[in-house]
Structure formats: structure tokens, C-alpha cells
Amino acid sequence: MEQLAVLKKLSALSNTPGIGAISAKKLADQYGGINALFDFDNKKAAGLQHDKVENLRQAIGHTYRSQDNHLRAQKEQAFMAAKGVDLTHYGQENYPELLRECPDAPMGLMMRGSWPKNQIFIGVVGTRKPSKYGVEFCRELIKELAPL
């Protein structure tokens, strides 16, 4: 899937009121993946719908089609190109298997390099705007884990 299209979908999921990581993952699973969730003409999905789910899906569609969402996705794409960052998302083969099992795992991950295969590793998933507490906690956690 084209990177900009994926970024638009991930942006819509993270910027639609009422949609968090857990509900985004549930919706993607229910509809058969991120692409199917955004296939608004999908007749097969009609049997899965009930009012609350369909209202959320329509809200996601509204956010997805907005100019603001498109601009956010373009900005992310430019950032990724400038920093040499790749993107993977929930449902892709290279999305970390153990992270997939977390109920509130992020729908998208930006990364440099490749994921180690068949190794135990620790990753810190964060935000670009962490709180002071979050920064300090992470710093202390990494300091404790580094010698291991």
C-alpha cells in the first residue's frame, strides 16, 4: 500500500474523536484489516455493522476525507523521508508479533533499520510530545535495563 495512503488512514484513526488504540484495533480486526475498514463501499462488511460501529466508521471516514488529515499525512511523509524512517502498521507481516498481542498497541510504528527476528528485545513506544514525568521515567527505565 502506498505510504501516503497508509499515513492518511493511520492519521484518521488517531484523530477521530472516540477512537483510541483499542477501538481502532478492534475495528480493523472486525473488518478484516485497515484497508477493509476504509473500504466504505464494502458490501461484505455490511453484515458486521450495527449502529455504534457504523457511526464510528462514518466518523473515521469524515476525518479521513478531510483536508487537514491529508496535510497531516503529507507532513508525516516529509518527516519520514527527511529522517530515513520506515513505516509499518498493524496487520502488516513485519509488525512485531508480540506487540500485536497488546490490546492498546499502536496502529502504526515508525522505525529505522529492521526488527530483530526471533530475539527478545525491548522497545520504547512513545510520543513526540512526552510529559516531563514520561521522559524521566523512560530515562530511568532504560538506565536500569542497559546493563542487561
Question: What are the residue ranges of the model-derived segments?
Answer:
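Short, positively charged patches
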Residues: M1-K143
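A short, Lys/Arg-enriched amphipathic alpha-helix followed by its capping loop at the start of a domain
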Residues: E144-L148
